[in-house]
Amino acid sequence: MRKFLGMLLGLVMTVASAAAQSPTADPALIEDLVAANRILYDQGVVDGFGHVSVRHDKTPEHFLLARSMAPGLVTAADIMEFDRDGNAIDPKGRAVYLERFIHSEIYKAHPEIKAVVHSHSPAVIPFGVTSVKLRPVFHLSSFLGGGAPVFEIREAGGSATDMLIRTPELGAALARSLGTAPVALMRGHGDVVVAPSLQEAVFRAVYTEVNARLEAEALQLGQGQVVFLNDEEAAKATATNAGVLVRAWDLWKARALATAR
């Protein structure tokens, strides 16, 4: 009887494990995620910290994210699968990012979002700690036309956090603050950028950083007087950019993967 129960328990565990395991993600998607990590490093959006994820193409409630490591060193072997709650499906002893809940909770709250970038973009951080709003100063940052809300972690986690989104509850609060915006600033921390594709998320993350630099320069040069894109200009430029951003992606990816060899 004991032997039978042991066999039965083993069978149940095997079935449960098989049920949790998703079909293998498209290798091309994994390659693009590796490229995204390296592009963001090459473009100065991330350094040793920061991360980017993409929805699983065959199991949409799951997502792909590298193990806890510097983005500029990520390879295909480092990509892991996570469930909707941020649990690693098959960790194999690998360390995971403390802030994976940024990704899990945004995907959970916003089914239309297919990719998430979290960074500590240096030029962006000042806009999260001052009253100056991040607004589009040129056509490639037109997606900022609707504004970028600022997430205040004290409102969700009190005044004694380490500023990290290390719990599902904090991740959910960030997802609510993001709303339908493509970018949310995180006071004293960085920002999160989202998009309906991995390529567009990378494009937006790069040009969020570029816009922040240009806006700061324009404000100084113009002594606070800057002509920003209006709503109509921003909407039209965003539509145009969606059709041509692959040009930047192809260039960035080729360079990023070439340096990886």
Model-predicted segments: where are they?
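Glycine-rich flexible loops
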Residues: 20-261
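Positively charged n-region of N-terminal signal peptides that target proteins for export
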Residues: 1-4
